[in-house]
Curated annotation (Swiss-Prot):
Keywords: Cytoplasm, Elongation factor, Protein biosynthesis
Residue ranges crossing the lipid bilayer per the database entry: none
Gene for this chain: efp
Protein name, per record: Elongation factor P
One Pfam family it belongs to: EFP
Function of the molecule: Involved in peptide bond synthesis. Stimulates efficient translation and peptide-bond synthesis on native or reconstituted 70S ribosomes in vitro. Probably functions indirectly by altering the affinity of the ribosome for aminoacyl-tRNA, thus increasing their reactivity as acceptors for peptidyl transferase.
Predominant cellular place of this UniProt entry's protein: cytoplasm
Family: Belongs to the elongation factor P family.
Amino acid sequence: MSVNDLRPGTTFLYDGNIYLVLEQAFSKTGRQQGKVTVKAKNMRTGARVELTFTGGEKVDKAMIERKEMQYLYNDGNDAYLMNTETYEQVSIPMTRLEWEKNFLVDGLMINMTEFENEVLGIDLPVKVELTVVEAEAAVKGDTTSGAQKKAILETGLEIMVPLFVNQGTKIIVSSADGKYVGRA
């Protein structure tokens, strides 16, 4: 595939790595051949890089497979997922799930991404239901609109929640930024 065809969301192979296009820009000056600048994420390491190609240069399209999986548990080193159709279990190193581990609860349905049977990572649901295990006491009289307090969730994630949220409350949290969305 030509680098001119790269668009956000496209995956491609370059220098032995798999990249996901985040942004793409084409620039041409005078008589020179155009340049394509791509901001991409290395799907193996998670590193974000900027790659520059000569217009018309070719790269291989990476066929990424997504499978719906159920999160089972983690043993500290690896997270274990199960394919609900075949009951096949797969493990992913927790080091690849630095942000995602804040939302992984038993039974959560997620999408696992893989390339040629190599597990690259997981895609979380947009919103996840979690339980508050510890919450600061609300200060009496602190009723300014939007007043918030700290709460620790069952996964260890610490977030700001409204004053009415107490220990044991089930809440909905955005997996994109870790912010409180609402009550479950």
